């Protein structure tokens, strides 16, 4: 046939099917993505290293000889409109059909047709065809843009040749004459069915042989994205290139990616802060609720991308699109149910179902039949995940961390991470560089985080595989390296507070609820590695436990399942934060006893010489305090699960914790700490407005932690208090000393936490340099203090600290000669100085020789090609490519790797061999550097005790500095308290103010004089109107005493005190629903503790005792308690009340002083003006009606209330004046009869009982 006839025949054919052509063309071209022109090096590093290859379609001509494992297609990046500015096609073109969704975008086809080949354009985006073709074919590249690379060739070769014919027609307008013509078989573009897809599984495969090298800087390649394989997300541009390059390279064995789900949209927006979701509330244990209280572990569910609108069946009765889609979904669901039946019927490792009393939500049962079907990566994943079902597992794959199944659902629902439905498993992912950020976000929500890392690099695996003699599964080695919880964080970047974060184990021994329990306690601050242990017998109200928990405020608790009483659980709930994590672990097997602890210590080699090398406190507790050792055993087991047991125990940092320290410190129980708002306020539980917030002005984080301990235990000895006051006064009066201390303190990092990371061998090189620089600064400061201020500081605590601090000058100088500090700080690598380490020097020399050989080879090529402009170019992981001008001919055995308009880049066999030798040498050098890091840390840790002592001394100086700064911030007047050592208690404050009143209110605050003890009465009975300032006065006296005994100035014109042994408070009115205790019962319980424990040198504050019951009972109880305090105990204190008759009862008692808070009252308008002044006398009324008027109650209601009040006052006058009648009418005597086991009340013994209160 002639050429003309062929043309006519083709024209006729095209005339008959133009519409068919348009639909067919669009069906293909709408799947081809636009070429991205991003040139960001950091994006290149992240995206190119997480790519995986795909199989060449069966329809492609095999003569292309393209190695199906050689390409490394780029990931498609999120684009902005600006990316297409130069590639858009005229929207008015008749060839551009309206956008529509892909009717074959369902994921079901992969599970139904696993044997079919994969279509070449699977998972391509739905970009405009015009954009694609203009960018990929017609657009002229810039001078330095990539125009040729094997990857790009692979992308085009994977398409049928008819694509280019269709493309050519698309680029050139078609006449209207041809619009309705039908395409011939030759012209029809290749459009593979969605069913043509290779077998896939739920996760990415590790089975491939093409390793990638470490990424390097270079311009961004412009490539067509041919598949959306193992990279399910793209690292955003803001992730630095340095951090990306420092990461492990992607698995060589992952790049085949059998688990690819090409139809899914895998891109993820990450690393930007996620807006808070209002629908999810923060809870004490979000993870537990997610797995235990929420739905069971979700079965995988398919997702269908796009919206396929149903179409009618054709004339031949073929199923329409909707029916096919329904069939595919049913088959997909059936396959998942068959393969993952154990995810639908959830059981724990012991095969207990959800709801069973013994069900353990931490584990999952996987039947043996399921293991037989798993691929190597699946086995690796489930082997770890099955024991961490209550934990969100971050699984490293190359430069990304991925979350699967329920973990992925949490990431998607709570943090809006992009969710991808695999065939059997949902997945979300984050870049490796942003792990710390996302881990912190999950932990802040109450989740437990597990980190599974690659334990070898891709090149390292290749070297290891060559050394193997037997065939093994091709999967990169991974292992559980960390489990992170809010109570056991160790990384400085994740810790949100400078204060200690504790994880506490509690062991209880109790025979019955009515007996006094015994407790063993062990808690640890994992950021510093400090263990604290104690054992004690408590009262039935758990007073000591309450005090300890209030002081420590643990973030995480470990309790023995079914072995701790409900009373103790209620006491713990009352003291700890609602966000605290509760862990109930199994007795014996997990909550270890003495014998098991001893065996584990010996077997685990935690201390030098085994048990003999253990700290003294631990050895003594092993033989004497079994409850405390059992608590340590539980904590020991828990730390082992978190991979922290070796790091923490081997430090040997153990001490005994005494919550009361009765012999040396001022005792404040938990109730007092809460009532006085020492560490947490009553508003939101935060530190704003607390005494700690006011006084703690420490500069260093470790100084703040020590100051917290000081405030928990103010001093009791007058000598010790005066010694502290001397140092505070010295610093406050000497600006040069103050400036010197500030000068070296404010530049210090958190050395206490950092050296614990060095001990664990997990410190970064840059952090290690910070440690050394910090100790250099401290050592220099102590040298300066010794030289310049020893004379003025001699004889004070400051002088003792300066003299006692170890001098580490020689050791620090040795470290300056050990390695390059600048390189370690900036590049994160240890480079020993020449001659310091022979192995390192040899390896470094070998690398230099190999590089010299490469450059010698380059010089040889320059001569061979007679071109002096040849040079090496690194493109991604393809390093040392020979870059040659495009007009220079090269030998036929040179393989072109990439190129630009002006240059081409090549490899040859000789060059490849030398590059491989260099890369292997670099890999071995990294191993040597890793060993060097370990050697450095072991050497530093050999002086751990000296470093720690230097930190403690520095922290003490910081605390003294804080007290001097706090005193100056109090405002005038403030003074140094006078400490008087005498037998009887005494308090004197002139013009005392509340220290926590802010500066704006300080000028209007009314100061008061307070005198207790000595020549004055021990107890002040205080009356006054509501809102007159009674409670504020009571609190400010207690806080002034605490400040004085802490060693701080007090907000008064003059102060003189005898050191108190304890402070007890009973303030406010609250019930305890959890313990089934009414307001009155809570009042009496707290009062009972005070009566049991207070002594002559105790300061007692009782606010409106008796208001929780009837007037008569309340008055009787208040009378009896007050009488016992002033007549039998003799303590100092305040007793505020609204019972004016109580003042009459004690009007002539020599140890009671009657005082009131003054107020001016206008009866006509019912207005009360509070004067806030403490003066002698009894307030005649509480002026409740006046306060009611101020609150806005209706006048009619207030008038009626006044009339009723007058009637009640008259009716009760005779009752109040008759003590015998009070005793007879009150239930209080019945309470006494029960508690004291006295005989039944009779007319004879009632007067005797009443006499006991006089």
From Swiss-Prot:
Residues 79-90 have a biased composition (Polar residues). Its main location: nucleus. Residues 1-324 are annotated as: Disordered. It is found in: Nucleus. CDD domains: ABC_MSH6_euk. The modification Phosphoserine is found at residues 205, 299, 307, 309. InterPro entries: DNA_mismatch_repair_MutS-lik_N, DNA_mismatch_repair_MutS/MSH, DNA_mismatch_repair_MutS_C, DNA_mismatch_repair_MutS_clamp, DNA_mismatch_repair_MutS_core, DNA_mismatch_repair_MutS_N, DNA_mismatch_repair_MutS_sf, DNA_mmatch_repair_MutS_con_dom. GO terms for biological process: maintenance of DNA repeat elements; mismatch repair. Residues 62-72, 102-114, 295-313 have a biased composition (Low complexity). Transmembrane segments: none annotated. ATP binds at residues 1024-1031. GO terms for molecular function: ATP binding; ATP hydrolysis activity; ATP-dependent DNA damage sensor activity; guanine/thymine mispair binding; mismatched DNA binding. Residues 8-18 have a biased composition (Basic and acidic residues). Keywords: ATP-binding, DNA damage, DNA repair, DNA-binding, Nucleotide-binding, Nucleus, Phosphoprotein. Belongs to the DNA mismatch repair MutS family. Heterodimer of msh2 and msh6. This is DNA mismatch repair protein msh6. It comes from Schizosaccharomyces pombe (strain 972 / ATCC 24843).
């Amino acid at each position: 046939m002639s050429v003309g006839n062929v043309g006519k025949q083709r024209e006729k054919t095209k005339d008959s099917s133009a519409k068919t052509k348009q639909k067919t063309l669009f069906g293909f071209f709408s799947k081809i993505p636009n070429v991205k022109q991003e040139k960001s090096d950091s994006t290149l590093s992240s995206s190119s290293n997480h790519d995986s290859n795909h199989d060449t379609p069966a329809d492609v001509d095999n003569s292309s000889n393209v190695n199906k494992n050689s390409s490394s297609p780029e990931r498609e990046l999120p684009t902005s409109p600006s990316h297409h500015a130069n590639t858009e096609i005229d929207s008015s073109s008749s060839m551009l059909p309206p956008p529509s969704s892909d009717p074959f975008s369902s994921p079901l086809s992969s599970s139904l047709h696993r044997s079919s080949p994969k279509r070449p354009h699977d998972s391509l985006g739905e970009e405009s065809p015009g954009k694609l073709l203009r960018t990929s074919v017609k657009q002229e590249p810039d001078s330095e843009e990539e125009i040729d690379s094997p990857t790009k060739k692979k992308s085009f070769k994977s398409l049928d040749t008819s694509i280019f014919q269709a493309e050519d027609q698309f680029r050139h307008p078609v006449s209207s004459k041809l619009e309705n013509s039908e395409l011939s078989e030759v012209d029809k573009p290749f459009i593979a069915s969605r069913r043509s897809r290779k077998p896939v599984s739920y996760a990415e495969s590790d089975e491939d042989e093409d390793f990638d090298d470490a990424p390097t800087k270079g311009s961004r390649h412009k490539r067509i994205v041919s598949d959306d394989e193992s990279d399910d997300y793209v690292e955003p541009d803001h992730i630095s290139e340095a951090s990306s390059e420092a990461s492990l390279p992607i698995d060589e064995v992952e790049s085949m990616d059998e688990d690819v789900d090409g139809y899914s949209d895998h891109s993820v927006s990450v690393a930007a802060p996620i807006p808070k979701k209002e629908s999810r509330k923060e809870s004490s244990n979000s993870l537990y609720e997610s797995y235990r209280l929420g739905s069971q572990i979700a079965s995988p569910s398919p997702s269908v991308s796009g919206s396929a609108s149903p179409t009618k069946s054709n004339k031949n009765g073929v199923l329409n699109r909707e029916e096919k889609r329904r069939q595919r979904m049913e088959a997909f669901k059936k396959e998942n149910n068959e393969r993952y039946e154990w995810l639908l019927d959830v059981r724990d490792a012991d095969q207990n179902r959800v709801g069973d009393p013994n069900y353990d939500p931490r584990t999952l049962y996987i039947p043996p039949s399921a293991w037989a079907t798993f691929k190597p990566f699946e086995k690796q994943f489930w082997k770890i995940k099955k024991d961490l079902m209550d934990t969100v597992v971050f699984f490293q794959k190359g430069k990304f961390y991925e979350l699967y199944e329920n973990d992925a659902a949490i990431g998607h629902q709570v943090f809006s991470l992009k969710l991808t439905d695999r065939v059997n498993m949902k997945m979300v992912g984050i870049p490796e560089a942003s792990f710390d950020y996302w881990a912190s976000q999950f932990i802040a929500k109450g989740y437990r985080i597990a980190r599974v890392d690659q334990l070898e690099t891709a090149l390292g695996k290749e070297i290891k595989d060559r050394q193997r003699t037997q065939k093994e599964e091709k999967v990169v080695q991974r292992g559980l390296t960390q489990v992170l919880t809010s109570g056991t964080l160790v990384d400085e970047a994740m810790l949100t507070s400078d204060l200690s974060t504790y994880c506490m184990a509690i062991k209880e021994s109790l025979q019955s609820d009515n007996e006094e329990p015994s407790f063993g306690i062990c808690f640890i601050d994992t950021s510093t590695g400090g263990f604290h242990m104690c054992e004690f017998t408590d009262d039935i109200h758990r007073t000591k436990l309450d005090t300890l928990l209030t002081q420590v405020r643990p973030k995480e608790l470990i309790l023995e399942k079914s072995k701790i009483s409900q009373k103790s659980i209620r006491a713990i709930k009352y003291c700890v934060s609602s966000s605290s994590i509760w862990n109930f672990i199994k007795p014996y097997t997990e909550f270890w006893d003495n014998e098991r602890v001893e065996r584990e210590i010996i077997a685990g080699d935690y201390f030098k010489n085994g048990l003999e090398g253990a700290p003294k406190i631990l050895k003594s507790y092993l033989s004497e305090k079994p409850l405390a050792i059992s608590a340590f055993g539980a904590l020991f087991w828990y730390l082992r699960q978190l991979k922290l047991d070796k790091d923490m125990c081997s430090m040997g940092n153990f001490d005994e914790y005494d919550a009361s320290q009765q012999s040396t410190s001022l005792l404040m129980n938990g109730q007092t700490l809460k009532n006085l708002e020492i560490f947490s306020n009553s508003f939101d539980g935060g530190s704003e407005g607390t005494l700690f917030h006011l006084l703690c002005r420490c500069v260093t984080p470790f100084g703040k932690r020590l100051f917290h301990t000081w405030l928990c235990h103010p001093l009791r000895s007058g000598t010790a208090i005066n010694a502290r006051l001397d140092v505070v006064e010295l610093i406050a009066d000497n600006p040069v000393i103050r400036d010197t201390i500030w000068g070296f303190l404010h530049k210090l990092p958190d050395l206490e936490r950092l050296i614990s990371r060095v001990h664990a061998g997990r410190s970064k090189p840059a952090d290690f340099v910070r440690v050394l620089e910090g100790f250099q600064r401290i050592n220099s400061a102590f040298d300066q203090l010794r030289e310049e201020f020893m004379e003025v500081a001699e004889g004070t605590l400051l002088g003792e600290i300066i003299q006692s601090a170890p001098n580490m000058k020689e050791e620090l100088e040795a470290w300056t000669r050990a390695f390059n500090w600048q390189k370690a700080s900036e590049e994160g690598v240890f480079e020993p100085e020449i001659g310091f380490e022979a192995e390192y020097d040899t390896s470094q020399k070998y690398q230099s020789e190999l590089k010299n050989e490469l450059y010698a080879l380059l010089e040889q090529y320059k001569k061979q090609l007679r071109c002096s402009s040849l040079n090496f170019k690194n493109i991604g992981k393809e390093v040392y490519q020979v870059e040659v001008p495009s007009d220079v001919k090269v030998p036929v055995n040179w393989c072109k790797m990439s190129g630009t308009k002006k240059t081409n880049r090549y490899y040859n066999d000789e060059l490849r061999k030398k590059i491989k030798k260099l890369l292997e040498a670099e890999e071995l050098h990294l191993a040597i550097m890793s060993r060097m890091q370990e050697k450095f840390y072991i050497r530093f840790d050999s002086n751990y005790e000296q470093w720690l002592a230097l930190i403690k001394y520095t922290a003490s100086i910081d605390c003294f500095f804080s007290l001097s700064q706090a005193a100056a911030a109090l405002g005038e007047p403030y003074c140094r308290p006078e400490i008087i050592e005498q037998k009887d208690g005494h308090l004197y404050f002139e013009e005392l103010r509340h220290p926590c009143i802010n500066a704006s209110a300080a000028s209007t605050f009314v100061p008061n004089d307070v005198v207790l003890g000595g020549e004055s009465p021990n107890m002040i009975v205080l009356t006054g109107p509501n809102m007159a300032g009674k409670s504020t006065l009571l609190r400010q006296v207690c806080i002034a005493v605490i400040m004085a005994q802490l060693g701080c100035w007090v907000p008064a014109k003059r102060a003189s005190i005898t050191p108190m042994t304890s402070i007890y408070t009973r303030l406010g009115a609250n019930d305890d629903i959890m313990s089934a205790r009414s307001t009155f019962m809570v009042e009496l319980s707290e009062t009972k503790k005070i009566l049991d424990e207070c002594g002559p040198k105790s300061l007692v504050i009782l606010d409106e005792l008796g208001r929780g019951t009837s007037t008569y009972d309340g008055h009787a109880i208040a009378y009896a308690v007050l009488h016992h305090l002033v007549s039998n105990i003799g303590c100092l204190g305040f007793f505020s009340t609204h019972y004016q008759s109580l003042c009459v009862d004690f009007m002539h008692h020599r140890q009671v002083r009657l005082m009131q808070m003054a107020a001016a009252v206008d009866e006509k308008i019912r207005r009360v003006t509070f004067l806030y002044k403490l003066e002698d006398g009894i307030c005649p009324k509480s002026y409740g009606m006046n306060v009611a008027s101020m609150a806005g109650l209706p006048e009619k209601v207030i008038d009626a209330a006044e009339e009723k009040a007058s009637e009640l006052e008259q009716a009760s006058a005779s009752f109040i004046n008759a003590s015998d009648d009070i005793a007879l009418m009150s239930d209080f005597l019945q309470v006494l009869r029960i508690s004291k086991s006295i005989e039944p009340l009779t007319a004879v013994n009632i007067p005797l009982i009443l006499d006991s209160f006089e």
